[in-house]
Amino acid sequence: MPIRLGPLTIPWPGTGSRGDPYWESFLNRPVNDARNVAAEMIRRAPEGAINPIKADIHTPEITSSHIKELAYFVGAELVGIARVEPEQAGDGEALPFAIVCALPAQHDPRETPGVGGQVPTQNGLFATFVVAAYIRELGYRATAAADPNAERLAAAAGLGRLNADGRLVARKYGRRVHVAEVIRTDLPLAADGQAVPV
């Protein structure tokens, strides 16, 4: 049996990985079992209860900076807050703020269904799950969910601009950015942009 001497080197994700059948499979082959992708487990995790005792919070500006720092700490690279028009809040619940997190994505998760292609999705789900849970612990409503207007909310929250296709283009990452699940909350926050009807 051969003994490995020295560190294991993997040619990924360097440019030399193009054409590597294992790398291509890692990115592009749909998973055989959804339980092999952490994203499905996080999506199915039940939301915790809202703390019945509301925390004594700071001003909306300070609270917003704390929430953003938490999101950065748990893996988000871009974080912004958009105010959502109350009459457009959807199911009648007034959750006037949308916290939008985004992460760099070398490969678009919508086009790369393999385990590797879903890394930005998994990381984004983890970040939004933790932030929403923390807000509920503060005694406020918060829910993280897929939103068909996520990229529009991201632009309204100052994370970038929308291109002609309606996709987010971030200053730092260009189009190589994944917008995570959107957190809707009634925690008093300071929006980074104008109110958005959705």
What residue spans do the PLM features occupy?
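Catalytic cores of enzyme domains
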Residues: 77-198
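Iron-sulfur (Fe-S) cluster-binding modules
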Residues: 1-83, 90-95
